[in-house]
């Protein structure tokens, strides 16, 4: 048998990018031989094994044939007679269809095996499909878009983009399971330039199928005095990219993506103003998250950011009582960590605008100082001093928090 490192590990090594983990293909072996050498079988649809020492995954070389629509509609063939080139031919992109042999000690040996000119495409910074079988797996649309977010200076080859459009037109994107859509979108959001993912999805028409709420934002105008970039879709991409540049978490980046969804449903006769878009955004985020099975922490932050980001931008105008009400409404007193992420998302919103990416955002510091003061109030001690009347306790605690915030910010009211 021969063992090869394949795919992303070879690509990243050639690019000079740190290799996170490796995928291995075994040619000329049977499942029984793998087990005899101590490998543990874990594959469900095709033979994948864990190395007895490193626990890395090793897959037997295989070919695959499309048998039904969607992500799971494949029939796999694996046997000792499947060659390395045949295994590489089933892969999505030429830059992912390269291999190097692995020595018994685990070192890469010999030249790069590159039957589809992946090295040339790496040099040209091009995503190019390996063959016509590319159209058989709709997940590849999402994967290419995600790769675009990681390798932002790459472009999609014209013929590859044409195939992606054909797949979308044929309804293949509609067959994607929700969990896989979210998985790829989430991974793309965590790359260096998430806007590139959405640009590729828009180019091939897939964004309108998997995230129609986001796709609808392009072409929706905003007031130029607040948004020099004008177009809502452009603004949202700038917000997401700003959040990525700051290294913010997935919940923050998802909130950045969804905070203005309601602007797409603003009546045409009131544009470019968007009165009430916050509430409309909330009503769009809820079914989106349910449809894609978005994790609760992402959904909850997105909802509070969508509802409150306009208010948060205006906190410099708020007195102590209004600030405490804002904290109570956004659950900041009980969930300060989530509130910190809310500040990050709103700061990204303020700076994700043409020419305004370095503008001061004093709202964040004002809220941090005020929240520390409000949370310093000992609600338990106040409750013990007031008695059993719940409303009296709430009122006394609220007044104490207002006074604490007033003193912390030296606000005269």
Curated annotation (Swiss-Prot):
Every HD domain range: 232-333
Reaction it catalyzes: a tRNA precursor + 2 CTP + ATP = a tRNA with a 3' CCA end + 3 diphosphate; a tRNA with a 3' CCA end + 2 CTP + ATP = a tRNA with a 3' CCACCA end + 3 diphosphate
Cofactor: Mg(2+); Ni(2+)
Alphabetical list of InterPro entries matching this protein: CCA_bact, HD_domain, NT_sf, PolA_pol_head_dom, PolyA_RNA-bd, tRNA_CCA-adding_enzyme
Keyword Ribonucleoprotein: no
Molecular function terms, GO-annotated: ATP binding; CCA tRNA nucleotidyltransferase activity; cyclic-nucleotide phosphodiesterase activity; magnesium ion binding; phosphatase activity; tRNA binding
Amino-acid positions noted as binding CTP in the UniProt annotation, renumbered to this chain: 8, 11, 91, 143, 146
Sequence positions that bind Mg(2+): 21, 23
Keyword Hydrolase: yes
Domain of life: Bacteria
Protein residues bound to ATP: 8, 11, 91, 143, 146
Subunit details: Monomer. Can also form homodimers and oligomers.
Domain notes: Comprises two domains: an N-terminal domain containing the nucleotidyltransferase activity and a C-terminal HD domain associated with both phosphodiesterase and phosphatase activities.
HAMAP family registered for this protein in UniProt: CCA_bact_type1
Name of the protein: Multifunctional CCA protein
Organism: Burkholderia ambifaria (strain ATCC BAA-244 / DSM 16087 / CCUG 44356 / LMG 19182 / AMMD)
UniProt lineage: Bacteria, Pseudomonadati, Pseudomonadota, Betaproteobacteria, Burkholderiales
């Amino acid at each position: 048998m021969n063992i090869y490192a394949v795919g992303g590990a070879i690509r990243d090594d050639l690019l000079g990018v740190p290799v996170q983990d490796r995928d291995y293909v075994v040619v000329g072996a049977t499942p029984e031989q793998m087990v005899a050498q101590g490998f543990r079988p874990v594959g469900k649809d095709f033979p994948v094994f864990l190395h007895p020492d490193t626990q890395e995954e090793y897959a037997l070389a295989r070919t695959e044939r499309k048998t039904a629509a969607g992500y799971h509609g494949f029939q796999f063939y694996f046997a000792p007679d499947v060659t390395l080139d045949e295994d590489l031919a089933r892969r999505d992109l030429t830059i992912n269809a390269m291999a190097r042999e692995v020595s018994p000690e685990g070192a890469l040996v010999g030249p790069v095996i590159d039957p589809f000119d992946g090295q040339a495409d790496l040099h040209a910074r091009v995503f190019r499909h390996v063959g016509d079988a590319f159209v058989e797996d709709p997940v590849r649309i999402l994967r290419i878009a995600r790769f675009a977010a990681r390798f932002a200076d790459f472009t999609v080859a014209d013929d590859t983009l044409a195939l992606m459009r054909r797949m979308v037109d044929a309804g293949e994107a509609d067959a994607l399971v929700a969990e896989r859509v979210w998985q790829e979108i989430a991974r793309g959001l965590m790359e260096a330039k998430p806007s590139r993912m959405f640009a590729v999805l828009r180019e091939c028409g897939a964004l309108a199928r998997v995230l129609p709420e986001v796709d609808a934002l392009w072409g929706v105008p905003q007031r130029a005095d607040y948004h020099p970039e004008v177009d809502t879709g452009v603004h949202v991409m700038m917000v997401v990219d700003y959040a990525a540049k700051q290294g913010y978490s997935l919940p923050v980046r998802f909130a950045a993506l969804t905070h203005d969804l309601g602007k797409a449903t603003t009546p045409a006769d009131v544009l470019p103003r968007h009165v009430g878009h916050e509430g409309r955004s909330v009503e769009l985020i809820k079914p989106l998250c349910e449809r894609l099975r978005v994790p609760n922490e992402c959904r909850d932050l997105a909802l509070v950011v969508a509802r409150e980001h306009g208010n948060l931008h205006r906190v410099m105008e708020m007195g102590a009582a209004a600030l405490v009400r804002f904290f109570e409404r956004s659950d900041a007193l009980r969930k300060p960590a989530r509130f910190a992420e809310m500040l990050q998302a709103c700061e990204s919103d303020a700076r994700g605008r043409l020419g305004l990416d370095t503008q001061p955002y004093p709202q964040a510091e004002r809220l941090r100082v005020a929240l520390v003061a409000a949370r310093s109030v000992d609600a338990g001690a106040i409750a013990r001093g007031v008695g059993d009347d719940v409303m009296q306790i709430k009122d006394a605690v609220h007044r104490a928090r207002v006074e604490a915030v007033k003193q912390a910010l030296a606000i005269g009211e």
